[in-house]
Amino acid sequence: INADLKFAYDNLAGTMSAKGRVNKWAAGAMYGKALLFQKKFAEARTVLKDVYDNGTTAAGAKYALLAKYADNFNAETKNSTESVFAVQYSVNDGSSGGDNGGWGEVLNFPYTGGPGTCCGFFQPSQDLVNAFQVDANGLPDPDNYNKREVTNDQGVPANSTTYTVDQAEVDPRLDWTVGRRGVPYLDWGPHPGVSWIRDQAYAGPYAPIKNTYYKSQQGVLTDKAFWTSGVTANNYTLIRFADVMLMLAEAEVEVGSLEEARRLVNLVRARAANTEGFVKNSPAKYKIGQYTTPWADKTAAQKAVRMERRLELGMEGHRFFDLVRWGIAEPTLNTYLKYVSGRSVNSWPVPNNKRNFLINANFTAGKHEYFPIPQAQIDRSTSGGQRVLQQNHGY
């Protein structure tokens, strides 16, 4: 894998004939990520810094953060200066059954009545929502965010007129990451609550939003010839520039450059603080600040960078793999499972939307970091009478 990615990074051109094609810099970002996963921090830093300093899109535009956070998730602004490596989707292009559209997200829309009309899967957790709470300086509290639960509409009827949105200050990225009752949901109006949720008792009151299209885009940037309008032209972004910056910040921490890491994190946070990019007409209170003083030590820096990845990249498919490579999947996920199922943990209050069916759930270190390899594939790997593939530990 390293050899393939390095070859692509060394040999691909920076500009391509068509936007969206993988170029030298997309390959470099993926190569740097692979090195980071292997804890080759100095090597990862060299590659990721090159991408950060010199990288361009396939069209030749220098990588840069978009002015508005939410534009990263809008089909009208895809293949932007922040898009580094994205799976290209298109609709209404003559293909059969929307085959070139975003089928991978088709089940992950609000449940009935809203955008996509199906199927209410991939719901954000209460733990994630709580993580967006901030202190008086607009900073997150990685250790204590679950000491207070952000108010939700668990069990509140759709026709209730008494529910109000929580008034504690939160990072403005929350409402571009999570759909919650009473807050504008793109241009669909305020999220109506339970009527857009498949089963609150099973998975809570929140809806995904980053993969969702705008109402004004229906039939134009969604496929109009199939059973669901959830097949969209919104690319699936594997790596964006903010991710590159935070991976570089992580590598800087590991090689001892804490101040450079702080600078990079603050740049990401500064974009999120652009009030023009806040959800408009929201009843929520938004606040986000900068890390104005040096981090005390490497441990504090790691904690800040890791928390920033969670907030910036929430619901984009990175979190589990980050926890595994940091070596903290077992304690983090078991703490979460205790919290969400109402078991006593860290003196946190029992969540309003606790999951009783998770009462016996447990993450086993050394096993659950990886799926089992299908037995059929192991059987087919026989060479010279010996099976080449070996089953992952614990299965």
Task: Annotate each predicted stretch with a short phrase.
Residues 108-117, 122-123:
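C-terminal cap/substrate-recognition region of VAO/PCMH-type FAD-linked oxidoreductases
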Residues 2-107, 113, 137-395:
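Acidic/polar-rich alpha-helix caps and helix-coil junctions
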Residues 121-134:
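Acidic-aromatic substrate-binding/catalytic surfaces of carbohydrate-active enzymes
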